[in-house]
Design a protein with these regions (language model features):
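A short SAM/SAH-binding and catalytic strip from SAM-dependent methyltransferases
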Residues: 113-128
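Conserved catalytic/acceptor-binding region of the Class I
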Residues: 150-247
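Class I SAM-dependent methyltransferase SAM/SAH-binding core
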Residues: 40-44, 48-104
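Acidic carboxylate diad motif detector
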Residues: 146-148
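C-terminal helical/coil "lid" or tail adjacent to the Rossmann-like core of SAM-dependent
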Residues: 2-12, 213-293
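A short acidic, Gly/Pro-enriched loop at the edge of an enzyme's catalytic core
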Residues: 103-115
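Conserved alpha-helix/loop element of class I SAM-dependent methyltransferases that forms part
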Residues: 19-39, 54
Length: 306
């Protein structure tokens, strides 16, 4: 399965993704990866095509691109976004999309110069199987490029309200999210911090010339919270809470937390703490005294197929 069912809603493709990458950093990556020489690229688990749409201008002029996702809805929307952005290559048949499972790709071996994914492996029950499929369809001497987060770190990043929290509360918060993460893994929903494991997985799979980079983007928040990027950063938190989705989906969080060895008592205590923290954040935002540097660990790992 390319993505767990709970992670398939449009809530996971919000406007904040439009701010994930700085243009000058993308140009640097394109130079490092020699994308100007790439004549074929496959984006596995492409979703709405955010990632491959950014890479496409850096490929060779006649390059062909294939986006693959398990969900037909995402493929249709990705095709439309490419048609809007690059109508001439799309009309010329240089861009195509295919519905397929990331762990069983309906593609011949040794087909693409570059095979890439963004936040795909973190959702797979068997991420190594997904990586092996990516390698299989990569040409010899081609590149595999994966973009994946370390979300346990990201969940624990500090902000201007952290000094108000006592040490015990912060320790319990770490335990809560650690058990949540381990429960997800135990239930086959994926490892949300898989970025930390990618270099070892690449080596185990036989890739060479392995390189690891960090995304250079942060999502700072500071008064008066007026620019579009800050609005896009705040919007998912509000939307998840009002719709009881994502980290505010109590039933889902309960399943993961208990599967990670947590107790029902601790779950209710921590969920209550989360609500209190959310209320404090809203008050601080309304009073113009909330700020955060907005750092997030996202790894870009590339390797070459022998």
């Amino acid at each position: 399965m390319t993505r767990g069912t709970e992670e398939q809603g449009s809530a996971w493709f919000r406007d904040q993704r439009d701010y994930w990458w700085n243009e000058d950093f993308l140009a640097l990556l394109a130079q490092r990866w020699r994308l100007c020489d790439v004549e074929s690229l496959a984006d596995i688990g492409c979703g709405l095509g955010h990632w491959s749409r950014l890479l496409f201008p850096y490929l060779s002029p006649d390059a062909r691109l294939l986006g693959i996702d398990r969900r037909l809805e995402w493929i249709q929307r990705a095709r439309q976004s490419f048609d809007d952005a690059y109508p001439t290559p799309v009309a010329a048949g240089k861009v195509a999309f295919q519905q397929s499972d990331a762990t069983a790709l309906a593609i011949c071996s040794d087909t693409f110069d570059v095979v890439t994914c963004q936040t795909l492996l973190m959702h797979l029950a068997e991420p190594f199987d997904g990586l092996k499929e990516m390698i299989r369809i990569t040409k010899p001497q081609g590149q595999v490029i994966c973009v994946e987060p370390s979300n346990l770190f990201n969940m624990m990043s500090f902000d201007s309200l952290t000094p108000e929290e006592d040490t015990e509360t912060l320790v319990k918060s770490f335990e809560f999210w650690l058990r949540y993460q381990r429960g997800r893994i135990a239930l086959g929903k994926g490892d949300i911090s898989i970025g930390e494991l990618l270099p070892g997985m690449f080596a185990q799979a036989g890739l060479t010339d392995i390189r690891v980079y960090l995304r250079d983007t942060a999502f700072p928040l500071y008064p008066p919270y007026a620019d579009p990027e800050q609005s896009a950063t705040l919007e998912p938190t509000h939307a998840w809470k009002t719709s009881a989705t994502g980290p505010w989906d109590y039933d889902q969080v309960r399943r993961y937390f208990l599967a990670g060895g947590g107790s029902a008592t601790m779950l209710d205590t921590q969920f209550s703490t989360l609500r209190e923290q959310s209320q404090r954040q809203r008050r601080a935002l309304s009073e113009g005294r909330y700020s955060a540097a907005g750092g997030a660990i996202v790894y870009l790992v590339c390797g070459r197929k022998p």
